From Swiss-Prot:
Superkingdom of the source species: Bacteria
Pfam family membership, one: tRNA-synt_1c
Protein name as it appears in the record: Glutamate--tRNA ligase
Lineage per the UniProt record: Bacteria, Bacillati, Cyanobacteriota, Cyanophyceae, Synechococcales
Uppermost EC category: ligase
Function statement: Catalyzes the attachment of glutamate to tRNA(Glu) in a two-step reaction: glutamate is first activated by ATP to form Glu-AMP and then transferred to the acceptor end of tRNA(Glu).
Keyword Nucleotide-binding: yes
Regions crossing the membrane: none
Gene name linked to the record: gltX
Length: 479
């Protein structure tokens, strides 16, 4: 059997991180077995489905590198196909028109709740006569279409993650609506028809869909098809074990992209949410994971989103990038911060900046604040930096550093060539090396913390800004 799986997001919102994890699992399983990975857009909700969400979903999957083999297939373009199946079920007596109003349904649910029963449709219109149907239509009622669910009946399947599962049809809420009054199909019917037509062999999705599975199995059987195999992955919760929400930070793939996570790092982390490779490795490409992916190693327990671990994984991927690659990734973030990248002193300067800050960032979005002093002139100072520069003897030491730097004939500006000059000034000013270095950082970067000082000094000198910043200290010190 040739494996065929699908990811089927609904464009009623941006691509959610949970949907992305489901896409990763489907992609891994398809690649592991040499199968097909189909993208389907479930856009039958006319009120909530929006083109901008569709664009966001497609862009998010593409950014993650989850290439699909077929699609995108849009449900909105298959309405006639669904309506034909609904008519087939009506003709065979497996479905019927239901004229119960929303007010009557609410009254029914209220009575059931008052009696301590679970709310359900009581199938009251399953056996309407033709005269009764005409009477309801004369009132102007528009019927929905309900699929007949036999009760009592046990529906069982062996979930590839959770093992054997059995549902009694008495717990399914009565005959289910499969089409609205306007003819638009509902979720359970549309996905079953699609999965049949697309030859889906494995449905891999979140555990929140377990309750839909028995209904869909009944529809498969009614349409004369064997159901596919099902695998329901655990939900992703926040660190406190509650449903992941916007209060916990980013929840959409686009937000993670804006925060500066690399797609390869985010894919790596998503694969580790509920799954682990046999060798226990935590850093791997999705291609390597595909060779190892198996449902036996998917944990049934809910996964907790761990920001610290994601940040660590991302930092490791950043460190693996070559300087030119890192510059390419950082450029949009620098540009968004308003940095002018066209006026750099030499072709390798940006690469050296990237090399300097690579160890100090977990996310690309952290780069602009860390490297701002290298791109913006005049320099702005933090209050602690100003206090440092106003300490006794510091202004004189900065003036001496400026004089020494101006007189030096450096064959090549580097941290190694600047170090002797710093040592010379420390000795000449009778100043402890630590105090001088701290003061130099304040003068050159406007802060007391940051990347390697001598490397920063060299980059500023190559740009022609170091001398001016040392001389500017005199203006910061009260007379």
């Amino acid at each position: 059997m040739s494996v065929c799986v699908r990811i089927a997001p609904s464009p009623t919102g941006n691509l959610h991180i949970g949907t992305a994890r489901t896409a990763v699992f489907n992609w891994l399983y398809a690649r592991r077995h040499g199968g097909r990975f189909i993208l389907r857009i479930e856009d039958t909700d006319r009120d909530r489905s929006l083109p901008r969400y569709t664009r966001n979903i497609l862009a998010g999957l593409a950014w993650l590198g989850l290439d699909w083999d077929e699609g995108p297939v849009y449900q909105s373009k298959r309405i006639e196909r669904y309506q034909a199946v609904v008519q087939q079920l009506l003709d065979r007596g497996l479905a019927y028109r239901c004229y119960v109003s929303e007010a009557e349904l609410e009254e029914m649910r209220a009575a059931q709740k008052a009696a301590g029963k679970a709310p359900r449709y009581d199938n009251r219109h399953r056996f309407l006569t033709e005269a009764q149907r005409r009477a309801y239509e004369a009132e102007g009622r528009q019927p929905v279409i309900r699929f007949k669910i036999e009760e009592p009946l046990e529906v069982s399947w062996v979930d590839l993650i959770r093992g054997p599962i059995t549902w009694n049809t008495q717990d399914l809420g009565g005959d289910m609506v499969i089409a609205r009054a306007d003819g638009c199909p509902l979720y359970n019917l549309a996905v079953v028809v699609d999965d049949i037509d697309m030859g889906i062999t494995h449905v891999i999705r979140g555990e929140d869909h377990i309750g839909n599975t028995p209904k869909q199995i009944l529809l498969y059987r009614a349409l004369g098809h064997e159901p596919p195999q099902f695998a329901h992955s655990p939900l992703i919760l926040n660190p406190e074990g509650k449903k992941l929400s916007k209060r916990d930070g980013a929840t959409s793939v686009a937000e993670f992209q804006q925060l500066g996570f690399l797609p390869e790092a985010l894919k790596n982390y998503l694969a580790l949410l509920s799954w682990s490779p046999p060798d226990g490795e935590e850093l791997f490409s999705l291609e390597k994971a595909a060779a190892l992916f198996d449902f036996d190693r998917v944990n049934r327990a809910a996964a907790r989103f761990d920001w610290d671990k994601l940040n660590w994984i991302n930092s490791q991927y950043i460190k693996r990038l070559s300087p030119p690659e890192l510059v390419e990734r950082l450029t949009p973030f620098w540009q968004a911060a308003g940095f002018d990248l066209s006026e750099v002193p030499d072709p390798t300067w940006l690469e050296d900046v990237a090399r300097l800050i690579a160890d100090g960032i977990d996310r690309l979005a952290e780069a602009p604040p860390l490297s701002r002093f290298l791109f913006q002139e005049p320099l702005s100072y933090t209050l602690p930096a100003l206090e440092q520069l106003r300490l006794p003897g510091v202004a004189e030491a900065m003036a001496a550093m400026a004089t020494t730097l101006a007189a030096a004939e450096l064959p090549q500006v580097s941290a190694d060539s600047l170090k002797p000059l710093v040592d010379q000034v420390a000795k000449g000013q009778n100043m402890k090396k630590g105090l001088l270095m701290k003061s130099l950082r304040a003068a050159l970067t406007g802060d007391l913390q940051g990347p390697d000082l001598l490397e920063s000094f060299a980059l500023l000198q190559r740009r022609g800004w170091a001398l001016g910043r040392l001389e500017a200290v005199q203006k910061l010190v009260p007379c």
